[in-house]
Regions:
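A conserved short beta-strand
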Residues: 178-202, 218-219
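Short conserved active-site loop signatures built around small residues
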Residues: 1-64
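Gly/Ser-rich "nucleophile elbow"/oxyanion-hole loop immediately N-terminal to the catalytic nucleophile
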Residues: 64, 115-161
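Short glycine-enriched nucleophile-adjacent loop
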Residues: 164-176
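Short amphipathic alpha-helix adjacent to the substrate-entry channel of hydrolases
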Residues: 81-103
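Short beta-strand element of the alpha/beta-hydrolase
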Residues: 65-74
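Alpha/beta-hydrolase-fold serine-hydrolase catalytic core, especially in secreted/extracellular enzymes
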Residues: 259-263, 269-356
């Protein structure tokens, strides 16, 4: 689906199956001035006042309704399109009864002159919710192929790199009635987002200075590679630690640290070199696992997570608790797990200081 006017990709121009309307992001991200923005507008043919709603969809046969999974790519060279990079797992999910959509945010990515230094993260998150608005409409419109086939009560977001930072922010915005910097900008999202997967997420943006994002009552999975040369630390651990379960429903959160995985091989559009030339020439790629094996891990863990979160198959929680139970499926290597659910009770967390 797309606006039908893309000048670089036919699948979002003449070949798109469902036409969408462009959206105005200027209240959140102004691209109207500067040489870099001028170059970008020449390349893309649009700016922040008319961002397209483009996406690739994989879906199962049958009437449904099927849970909806949105994939959000991260930052890369904008002309090397990132949204096709998750087909390997989207096709698997479609075969298991999910609608999977990989959305296009390439126009927010880097070019030869640099990137937006994470100032675009809010816009990345807001665009996720604008895509979900389209899905809500299609599910209610008889003249669309997705009429009454989407289970809008069971939605999950899967974000990679900056997409991994945008996804949890989208969950926060989803519950807000107005833009926190301008109350004249009303929001009316209120989607039923049940789960979130962060793949090697960044963590450089916060809605409040020096205050990390806090989530509650949602299922969470973090995948992080030990040989990541883009996101050097496990930035997603903040989300894990700041996610709290406060209602009476069952929720869970899990981390898988993959020693020999890098940043880019979770996407077929990126690859083994996490940093651009000439710095990439300094990388020692020998210890990395192969891309197929790394993506096999992502397929295994993300599908198990979604089955547990959106379909209530708690038997899939076993590998999220202990990677050794998946040894017959995933490549041989070093892994570390972390897991907690709403039944977990703290006896002591050693945060009491002198008041013990």
């Amino acid at each position: 689906y797309g606006n039908g006017d893309d000048k670089n990709r036919d699948e979002y121009a003449n070949s798109c199956d469902i036409k969408t309307s462009s959206v105005d992001a200027t209240p959140f991200f102004d691209q109207t001035s500067g040489f870099d923005n001028w170059i970008r507008e020449i390349f893309w043919g649009f700016g922040a006042s008319n961002y397209p709603i483009n996406g690739r969809v994989w879906y199962p046969e049958g009437q449904g309704p099927f849970p909806l999974v949105i994939f959000v790519h991260g930052n890369h060279l904008m002309q090397e399109y990132s949204d096709p990079g998750y087909e390997y797992i989207a096709t698997l999910l479609a075969s298991k009864g999910y609608i999977a959509a990989s959305i296009d945010e390439n126009f927010l990515n880097s070019n030869w002159s640099g990137d937006y230094s994470h100032n675009e993260i809010f816009t990345r998150a807001w665009l996720i919710l604008k895509h979900l608005e389209c899905w809500r409409e299609w599910n209610q419109q008889e003249d669309t192929p997705f009429y009454q086939t989407v289970d809008m009560d069971n939605i999950a977001l899967v974000g990679h790199s900056r997409g991994g930072q945008a996804a949890p922010l989208a969950i926060v915005i989803n519950k807000q009635k107005r833009y926190y910097k301008d109350a004249n900008q009303d929001f009316n999202f209120n989607f039923s987002i049940k789960g979130i997967v962060e793949i090697a997420p960044t963590a450089f943006y916060s809605m409040h200075k020096d205050k990390p994002l806090e989530l509650e009552n949602i299922d969470y999975l973090l995948l992080q590679g030990g040989y990541d040369q883009d996101v050097f630390s496990m930035a997603g651990s903040r989300k894990y630690n700041n996610l709290h379960f406060t209602d009476t429903n069952f929720h869970f959160k899990s981390v898988l640290y993959i020693y020999a995985a890098n940043h880019g091989q979770f996407s077929t559009a990126w690859g083994r070199k996490d940093i651009p030339f000439p710095y990439s020439a300094l990388l020692n790629l020998t210890p990395l696992m192969d891309g197929e094996g790394q993506r096999k891990i992502a397929q295994t863990y993300i599908s198990a997570f979604l089955d547990a979160s959106l379909k209530g198959k708690k038997e899939n929680l076993s590998i999220l608790k202990d990677y050794r139970l998946a040894k017959a499926i995933i490549p041989k290597g070093y892994y570390f797990n972390q897991y907690e659910d709403s039944g977990f009770k703290y006896i002591a967390d050693y945060e009491e200081d002198l008041d013990v």
